[in-house]
Amino acid sequence: QAKEVATNRSFPPSGDAAVSAKVREANGFLPWYFNLPADEAKFAEAWKQAADSKGFSAPYGQPPAERRHPQFRSHGVGKCEWDGAIWPFATAQTLTAMANFINNYQVKPCALAVSSKGSLDMDSLYFNEMEKYVQSQSMRGKPYIGEYLDETTGYWLKGDQERSRYYNHSTFCDLIITGIVGLRPRADQTIEVRPIIPAGKWQYFCLDKVRYHGHDLTILYDQDGSRYHVG
């Protein structure tokens, strides 16, 4: 497991591979992007950091470095810093990894609060982070994906400068299709649909004309049948 995917329980070393970095980075979630870690509690515990406001849970998304570190957001602004501001593609990588963890792994991390019982509600965590992701991708009331944004205010740090406005680095559609709606890509001819929508959040949804393995699919949910009048 690549030296326990670092001695710091699932977060890899930087630089010298024999010495763990003194800061957790969101790149530590990337092994789940490829379903690499074993389905064991010692690796699952890493996801508690995605829910921790001192870890990677910020008001406008998942920063690339943990918020508790003393040098978080300390390297200035506007020079491609990766010390805490939100980069949409990095967030997308974390969310893809999280969806894989939810769908493909049985062992889940313990609840964040010491006093709580049971496991961390990963479905709610994913949905809440997706809501942040959706809300962040706008500027002046219009859809927008920029270079990177402030993790607490949602302000695009490079505004609409050319360098920023050409940063089309979101996998937004994939996150909706394979994560929220839950059409899970497969090599065989099985259609697997596993939405990540906590109870009570949505009363209906419809994803129409999705081309998949040579077929056009419609995936819909209607809580009481009054929206689409089918099924």
Residue ranges and their predicted role:
Residues 12-13, 33:
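Accessory "access/gating" subregions that flank catalytic or transport cores
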Residues 15-17:
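Glycine-rich, charged/polar anion/phosphate-binding loops
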Residues 33-34, 178, 221:
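Hydrophobic side chains in beta-strands
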Residues 205, 221-231:
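Catalytic-core signal marking the mid-to-C-terminal active-site face
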Residues 3-10, 19-27:
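Aromatic- and carboxylate-enriched substrate-binding clefts and catalytic-loop regions
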Residues 22-38, 87, 91:
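An alpha-helical repeat/solenoid feature that recognizes helix-turn-helix modules
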Residues 1-12, 39-215:
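Non-catalytic carbohydrate-binding regions of carbohydrate-active enzymes
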